[in-house]
Amino acid sequence: DDFVLKTFAGKTFMDVFNAFYYSWSPAVAEAEYSNPALRETVKYMIYPLIGSLQLSRIAAEPLAAVSSELSVISAGVVVSNLLGIIYLAPISLLVRRFLLSRKRLPVTAPRLAWLMMVLLPILATAVYFQNGAVVAFASSALVLGGLCLGCALPYTIAKALASMRSR
């Protein structure tokens, strides 16, 4: 937390994240308190989150020598992709397999990667000029894009591998 909160981008994003998180987490905490099985489930589901946060920090640490802002933004991109892969991709693959097997979805990994590449200079410019509103928007959009990209990557990779095998 301290690593993130020492930067303008990190603090601004955490303000947005905390507003979102604390809008629903008290209800979950209350449900956990009265349900030991739910408490155990949540406990085990948090382990990958903690590991992802640690990995993203390790991956971004070398960039701190260049810029702490760049380091925090990189950590956010890494962790959002990892969380998309860990938490969203399995659900997405099941939904795609059983409910949307014949439909072509317009959201693809290359489009999401393009979106993230567009957001990065917007975020960098907003950080440079210390524009809190744009940083809040761009950092949140970047994290959501990273979650979606992480969600789309396993399907994209599996599809590419299947295509290579069929040649």
Regions found by a protein language model. Give the residues of each.
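Long, compositionally biased charged/polar accessory segments in the mid-to-C-terminal portions
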Residues: D1-R167
